[in-house]
Every structure is written in structure tokens, then in C-alpha cells.
Amino acid sequence: MASNTLIESTSVRRSPAEHLAEAMAQGSTAGTVQLREIAFATQVGVRAVPGSGGFAALAEAVGTGLPQQVGVVAGSVEGTAVLWLGPDEFLAIAPEGAELAAELVAALGDEPGQVLDLSANRSVLELSGPAAPLVLRKSCPADLHPRAFGVNLAITTTLANIPVLLWRTGEQSWYILPRASFTEHTVHWLIDAMSEFASEPVA
């Protein structure tokens, strides 16, 4: 008799850059520039009009408030953070396993707004180290100077000719969020751009 076996989804899931982990490690240089994937981060799309009941409910439920200025990130990379994408559009990011989408749906109730689990929509890559801005500047048109792009700011820009979300999470660390389908292209470009920092400069 045939039998059915249920397999835990977590045992078979694969992150967009899982197969590139070794290449990212080999392309990284300790103390200079490093690249890794933040796998399976919880990502929730939120839409609500500022001033509405839905906005107030979601702002309270997410625990960080919802940012109301271009580029502002509410919260921090250590916990839940909310990135401003537009006047009524936001992306909440939380650690793997967070039940954020369900919590926000419950909080929204019948108020106007939208909550959507987007965890599979984008990959999350972390580029860190003192040379990280030099790598990004090779293809990113945004002004990355600290006076213009401070810690905990995030923007929509391009990198390697594809659209990405770029979030400065620390003085020397950045989150890069390309669409999942562009992850491999982005990683290979970053590894190539990092290659000049792999060896000590010739005196």
C-alpha cells in the first residue's frame, strides 16, 4: 500500500543564495570587505495611508512605528525594522521565524490597509567592512557619503543594472535586497567588485 509522508517545509527550503555561500566566503577578505546572505529573513509588505485608522493600528502593532519620511527606517537591524518605500507603502523586516504577517493582519482587522508576506520576494545580502562603500560605488549611482546616506537610511536604487533596496545598517555595513530572481547576478557582480581588495596592495 502506498503511503503519504509529510515533509517539514523547513527541511527542503532553499534560500536564493544558499548555493553561493562558499563563493561569497572565498570572495570576502576579513577586515576589508565581506559578503554573506541573511537567509530566510521575514519580510512583510504593508500599505496604509498616514492618518488613517489602519496606519495607526499597524504602527502600534509593528512595535517600531511606521516611518513617515523618505529613506527613514524605523526600528533596527537587531530586531524588527520598517523601511519607507512610498507615502503609504512600507517593508517590515524581522528575524527568521517571526510571525509578523499574522500579527499585523490581526491588528489591521477591518481597517483600510494591506498586509502581505513577501519573505520569498527578495533576498537579503549583507556587505560589510571599510571597503564596502567602494564596492557599491562601482555600480550604484546613489550618493553613499555618510553626510547624505547615514546609518538606518534605506533607498530604492540600482546596483549592477538591477533595482535593489539599499539599507545602511551600520557605519560599515549595508543590506542589499534584490528580487530573488536577481540574487545570483547580484552576488556574482559583488564578488567580482570585491576582488581588488582580496590581496595586499603592492608597496
Curated annotation (Swiss-Prot):
This protein's record includes keyword Phosphoprotein: no
Pfam family, one: SoxG
Gene Ontology molecular functions: sarcosine oxidase activity
Keywords: Cytoplasm, Oxidoreductase
A GO CC term attached to the entry: cytoplasm
Protein's recorded name: Sarcosine oxidase subunit gamma
Family note: Belongs to the SoxG family.
Keyword Ribosomal protein found: no
Note: Utilization of tetrahydrofolate is probably the physiological reaction since the products are substrates for serine hydroxymethyltransferase, an enzyme which is part of the sarcosine oxidase operon.
EC number of the protein: 1.5.3.24
EC supergroup of this enzyme: oxidoreductase
Reaction catalysed by this enzyme: sarcosine + (6S)-5,6,7,8-tetrahydrofolate + O2 = (6R)-5,10-methylene-5,6,7,8-tetrahydrofolate + glycine + H2O2; sarcosine + O2 + H2O = formaldehyde + glycine + H2O2
Role: In the presence of tetrahydrofolate, catalyzes the oxidative demethylation of sarcosine to yield glycine, 5,10-methylenetetrahydrofolate and hydrogen peroxide. In the absence of tetrahydrofolate, catalyzes the oxidative demethylation of sarcosine to yield glycine, formaldehyde and hydrogen peroxide.
Intracellular or extracellular location(s): Cytoplasm
Assembly description: Heterotetramer composed of subunits alpha (SoxA), beta (SoxB), gamma (SoxG) and delta (SoxD).
Gene Ontology biological-process entries: sarcosine catabolic process
